């Protein structure tokens, strides 16, 4: 099976690529490297012990996507590509709506032209907003609280509508929270460009010496467990 990974050089995409290769799949990656680098692709090939066909493209370009599908006999797609910083989405909502929704619609259109009918979409638990009940299950109501979450929810709805119109199409929507960790080899992991959007990259960067220290802000909640009470409860 030949699988296209959009955003496949990113944190989750790179680990997915390695696992697919280990399972015997051929992998094609389309990534604009806005939050990764070419070295990651080399490491994917090293860990997967196979060659990856890599396209440095913006998935928002329908012509570029058309080239990928024309040059490869794609069996299935996993769609990771998209902007993903909640805070940035609040400051720059139009950029997020245009980028993430254009990418989704372009991908679906090109898939239909090439009769590719299997898609896994990397959605997000942000579609649940602030849940009234935890733990969350799939039956919880959705109500997003930021533009990033809305782009994920809108992409899901577009996919539902396309599925309703095309019975051959099979789409899985994955709503997950932020993962942490790295490949056991240490060769790939979360290494964002610019300022990290969550805690774990800061910890990793301190561990490897890229940052001098991990800053903890505030000193007026001296609790035994620290994070759990100080940062969440208070």
Outline where the language-model segments fall.
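N-terminal Rossmann-like NAD(P)+-binding domain of SDR-like oxidoreductases, especially those catalyzing
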Residues: 1-182
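NAD(P)-dependent short-chain dehydrogenase/reductase
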Residues: 160-233
């Amino acid at each position: 099976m030949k699988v296209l990974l959009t955003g496949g050089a990113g944190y989750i995409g790179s680990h997915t690529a390695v696992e697919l290769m280990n399972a015997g799949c051929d992998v094609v990656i389309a990534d604009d490297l806005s939050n990764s680098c070419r070295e990651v692709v080399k490491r994917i090939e090293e860990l997967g012990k196979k060659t990856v066909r890599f396209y440095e493209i913006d998935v928002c370009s329908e012509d570029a996507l058309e080239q990928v599908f024309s040059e490869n006999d794609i069996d299935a797609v996993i769609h990771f590509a998209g902007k993903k910083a909640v805070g940035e989405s609040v400051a720059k909502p139009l950029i997020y709506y245009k980028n993430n929704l254009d990418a989704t619609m372009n991908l679906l259109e090109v898939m239909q032209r090439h009769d590719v009918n299997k898609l896994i979409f990397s959605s997000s638990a942000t579609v649940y907003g602030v849940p009234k009940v935890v733990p969350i299950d799939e039956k919880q109501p959705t109500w997003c609280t930021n533009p990033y979450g809305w782009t994920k929810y809108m992409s899901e709805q577009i996919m539902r509508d396309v599925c309703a119109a095309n019975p051959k199409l099979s789409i899985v929507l994955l709503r997950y929270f932020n993962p942490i960790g790295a490949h056991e080899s240490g060769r790939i992991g979360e290494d964002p460009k610019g300022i990290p959007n969550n805690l774990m990259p800061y910890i990793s960067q301190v561990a490897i010496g890229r940052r001098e220290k991990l800053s903890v802000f505030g000193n007026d909640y001296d609790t035994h467990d620290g994070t759990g009470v100080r940062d969440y409860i208070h």
